[in-house]
A protein has these predicted regions:
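Glycine-rich beta-alpha loop segments
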Residues: 2-7, 13-106
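Generic secondary-structure signature for well-ordered alpha-helical cores
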Residues: 36-39, 78, 97-101, 111, ...
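Solvent-exposed alpha-helices and their adjacent loops that cap or buttress functional pockets
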Residues: 41-43, 72-74, 96-97, 114-118, ...
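Structural motif
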Residues: 46-49, 78-79, 101-105, 121-124, ...
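Acidic/glycine-enriched connector segments
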Residues: 87-145
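Short gly/pro/ser/thr-enriched loop/turn and capping motifs at secondary-structure boundaries
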Residues: 110-115, 152, 180-183
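C-terminal functional extensions of proteins
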Residues: 175-241
Length: 241
């Protein structure tokens, strides 16, 4: 039997099972996540999204540094958005929660349930990763990226792709803990840049900062000549994100 003959046998009649109809109705649930999330997060600007591992223990230096960064951001007037779960996400929410600005958690429903951390002024749960990531991007004026795994890399690279391709306005992308990120950045330079997969200037999208105080300074420095509100030419980008 050839591969061409095998394919029909391996593809069930999804129409007969009502699969296609269920998929169509599922779109309404996706739309509801976008609408509800957008409405709930409208009051929080300016906000900074903090990404990082769910597995970082509270006694780990990364956790403590994240909490310090979030507290300083919150006291400076920035809402802080995290993934709403444990680890770095909890540290970000905790620092903001005890600061002066709202702490926002965007939780995700997973097969192995991710419990929302208790340090959230606004908590929103999503079923779909892409709707959740949209909120991280839509409402942030900067991204702070702590050490993390696949999920953190996914969020980092999505943010960079949107900026690189002009689908999102240029905002600070700050990697914290140079020792953790240097290997990845070296690979970007020695492989992606050298083989022409990205432009050398794309590396300028990233800042690497180790000191919490300098994270806040970097965000203010980026906006000091223009303010936090979108420029006229950026409004269309944000509407079409």
């Amino acid at each position: 039997m050839t591969a061409k003959d095998k394919l029909p046998q391996m593809m069930p009649n999804t129409e007969a099972q009502g699969f296609t109809a269920r998929e169509s109705w599922r779109i309404f649930g996706i739309m509801a996540e976008f609408v509800e999330g957008t409405e709930r997060l409208k009051p929080i600007r300016p906000a900074v999204s903090i990404f990082g591992s769910a597995r970082t223990a509270p006694d780990h230096p990364y956790y403590e540094k994240t909490e310090r960064i979030a507290r300083q951001l919150s006291d400076a007037g920035f809402s802080v958005i995290s993934g709403g779960g444990p680890g770095i996400m909890e540290a970000a929410n905790k620092g903001a929660y005890f600061g002066k600005s709202p702490s926002v958690g965007l939780n995700i429903q997973l097969p192995m349930e991710q419990q929302a951390n208790p340090y959230q002024d606004i908590s929103q749960t999503f079923q779909h990763f892409f709707a959740r990531k949209f909120m991280f991007v839509k409402f942030a004026i900067a991204y702070v990226v702590m050490p993390g795994g696949f999920g953190t890399l996914d969020e980092l690279l999505e943010a960079m792709t949107l900026i690189q391709t002009g689908k999102s306005r240029k905002i600070p992308v700050i990697l914290v803990e140079s020792a953790f990120w240097n290997g990845l950045l070296d690979w970007f330079k020695t492989t992606l840049v050298s083989e022409g997969m990205i432009h050398p200037n794309d590396m300028n999208l990233i800042q690497v900062i180790d000191e919490p105080e300098k994270v806040v300074d970097a965000i203010f420095n980026h906006y000091q000549t223009r303010g936090f509100l979108p420029l006229p030419e950026e409004h269309e980008l944000m509407l079409n994100l």
